């Protein structure tokens, strides 16, 4: 397990890793950008990203899901783990060691929820990831009702992918709800964008002093 609090070898103080989690339609990408803007206004260097990435391993999962024909669960897990290994090695850890904050739209908690809802063992997924992946300083679970999630996805006008049926999203939400990590915080995300951002700012202030 990579300790998020470990000291960097660089002259910079180590940055912080903040990840945004939740089912589709919760507004994660919007809140990533709002927090990034706030942190930059405080003079903090910020790197934003998302998972699965646009690298070859992440795109295999994305393209199969958008085609409505998911990979097998074993193939998904293998691709997602390799995608994350490269992301940690090439982007996340170098940025943190340089003193930058990293904000991610999805991380390995999504894998626990989504592949867990597909039948994989949730705790095994956590163990596989934490064997190499940086543990977040703060994870923000943006929680909304399933009905609102589907309304928002419909309003976006994007075609449904293989992960977006109501029963599956309900199972994912149940797994998120059962997660117990001291750095995981639930955010009620069915309010306005500004209301959700205010909750996030409060958590970041309490946990990271910013």
List PLM regions with ranges.
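NTP-dependent small-molecule kinase module
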Residues: 2-11, 36, 147-210
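Pre-Walker A (Motif I) flank of P-loop NTPase domains
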Residues: 13-17
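Hydrophobic anchor at the beta1->P-loop junction of P-loop NTPases
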Residues: 20
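P-loop (Walker A) phosphate-binding loop of NTP-binding proteins
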Residues: 23
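Conserved lysine of the Walker
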Residues: 28
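Hydrophobic positions on the alpha1 helix immediately C-terminal to the Walker A/P-loop
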Residues: 31
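ATP-dependent small-molecule kinase phosphotransfer cores
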Residues: 44-131
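A glycine- and Lys/Arg-enriched "phosphate-lid" helix/loop adjacent to the NTP-binding pocket
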Residues: 106, 111-174
């Amino acid at each position: 397990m990579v300790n998020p609090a470990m000291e960097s070898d660089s002259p910079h103080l180590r940055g912080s890793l903040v990840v945004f989690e939740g089912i589709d339609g919760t507004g994660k990408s919007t809140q990533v950008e709002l927090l990034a803007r706030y942190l930059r206004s405080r003079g903090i260097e910020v790197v934003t990203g998302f998972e699965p990435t646009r690298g070859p391993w992440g795109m295999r999962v994305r393209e199969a899901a958008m085609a409505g024909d998911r990979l097998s669960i074993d193939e998904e897990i293998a691709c997602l783990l390799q995608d994350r290994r490269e992301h940690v090695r090439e982007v996340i850890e170098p940025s943190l060691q340089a003193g930058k904050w990293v904000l991610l739209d999805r991380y390995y908690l999504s894998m626990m929820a989504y592949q867990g809802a597909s039948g994989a063992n949730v705790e095994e997924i956590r163990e596989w990831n934490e064997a190499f992946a940086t543990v977040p300083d703060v994870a923000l679970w943006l929680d909304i009702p399933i009905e609102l999630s589907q309304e928002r996805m419909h309003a976006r006008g994007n075609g449904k992918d293989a992960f977006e049926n109501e029963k599956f999203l309900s199972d994912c939400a149940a797994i998120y709800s059962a997660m117990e990590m001291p750095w995981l915080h639930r955010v009620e995300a069915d309010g306005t964008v500004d209301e959700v951002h205010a909750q996030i700012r409060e958590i970041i202030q309490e946990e990271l002093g910013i």
